[in-house]
Regions:
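OB-fold ssDNA-binding interfaces and closely related basic DNA-contact patches used
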Residues: 1-86
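Structured, beta-strand-rich domain cores
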Residues: 54-127
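Compact mixed alphabeta submodule
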Residues: 101-167
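Residue-level detector of solvent-exposed, low-hydrophobicity positions
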Residues: 14, 19-21, 90, 100-101, ...
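Residues that cap or initiate secondary-structure elements
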Residues: 35-39, 89, 123, 143
Length: 167
């Protein structure tokens, strides 16, 4: 069992309410991490997958084909790396001071956070891989709101600027 902590910015965030698409309820986040901070995590994940491949090799020593590998739980975008971390259960989150976030607080994309995750290797029909499970998290910069927020200003309160041109 490999438990690690990672810091990044949420690109997709279903941490306050579960994603109920495709008939399942899952809490998850895609965490964008700078490449220089992500390399250690990427190497650890590859080691876990490698250990699973070794175990599969022990159980099928006469296999002549390459073992099927599942997609890794991260995507290398060059300057940044996106980590896919999830949980079946609502993860516990804390603010910068260590106080638990209330149920009413909604964590939106662009929030920056530390997430403690457990990296777990697997060998299933889809292939050999690794899954990252959210254990808990701490918010650095919270971006929140509700679905009723309008991205536009109140036009009645905004006064148009009158510009005079000199000819």
């Amino acid at each position: 069992m490999h438990i690690k902590q990672i810091y990044g910015t949420a690109k997709w965030s279903y941490l306050s309410d579960p994603d109920e698409g495709f008939g399942s309820r899952k809490y998850h986040v895609v965490l964008e991490v700078p490449k220089n901070e992500a390399t250690e995590h990427m190497a650890d994940i590859k080691k876990i997958v490698g250990a699973e491949i070794v175990e599969q090799g022990k159980t099928t020593p006469n296999a002549t084909t390459k073992f099927k590998e599942a997609p890794l739980p991260f995507i290398d975008n060059g300057e940044t790396v996106d980590f896919k971390i999830h949980s079946q259960f609502k993860p516990k989150f804390f603010d910068r001071t260590g106080k638990a976030l209330g149920e009413e607080v909604k964590i939106w994309k662009d929030s920056s956070m530390w997430i403690t995750y457990k990296a777990q290797g697997y060998n299933k029909g889809m292939g050999i891989g690794c899954t990252l499970y959210i254990q808990s998290g701490q918010i650095d910069q919270l971006v929140t709101g509700n679905s009723q927020n309008c991205p536009y200003p109140n036009r009645d309160e905004v006064k148009p600027e009158v510009k005079q041109e000199i000819v």
